[in-house]
UniProtKB/Swiss-Prot annotation:
Keywords: Oxidoreductase. It is an enzyme of class 1 (oxidoreductase). PANTHER family: PEPTIDE METHIONINE SULFOXIDE REDUCTASE, PEPTIDE METHIONINE SULFOXIDE REDUCTASE MSRA 2. One of its GO terms (biological process) is protein modification process. Belongs to the MsrA Met sulfoxide reductase family. It comes from Methanococcoides burtonii (strain DSM 6242 / NBRC 107633 / OCM 468 / ACE-M). The active site is at C10. It catalyses: L-methionyl-[protein] + [thioredoxin]-disulfide + H2O = L-methionyl-(S)-S-oxide-[protein] + [thioredoxin]-dithiol; [thioredoxin]-disulfide + L-methionine + H2O = L-methionine (S)-S-oxide + [thioredoxin]-dithiol. This is Peptide methionine sulfoxide reductase MsrA. Its EC number is 1.8.4.11. It comes from the Archaea. GO terms for molecular function: L-methionine:thioredoxin-disulfide S-oxidoreductase activity; peptide-methionine (S)-S-oxide reductase activity.
Amino acid sequence: MERATFAAGCFWGVEAAFSKVEGVISTKVGYTGGTLKDPTYKDVSTGSTGHAESIDIIFDESVITYGELLEVLWNTHDPTTKDSQGPDHGSQYRSAIFYHDDAQREAALRSREQLERSGKYDSTIKTEIVKASEFSPAEDYHQKYFQKLQFKR
């Protein structure tokens, strides 16, 4: 099993997208990229901790590659906006790839460059590619948020 960590706006929708991907074993939403140890949603929502709302993914590389997960990421959000996605604004909603090893870093850089050259977007890609730091899981009520909503209907 391998691990991938991405940020692409509000983590609820990102988790909903990745949880449907064949080869994804598990997803967990949380916070990464900041300075505060064990941040809460309230802490991160101030925009002052440096954390991004993110998703931590465990995947089976014999079923789906890291590169294929990057394609899902690019198609899940607008990577040309800085510190916002849709109605959500602030550095906690930034687009980022948090790599866990050199192979992931190289794959992310290649993938971002290919997307830039594709001409799909008129603006430059703003997605950060940074070394993964500690991932702090979000509160339970954030986990599988959209899945929980479906069961309440």
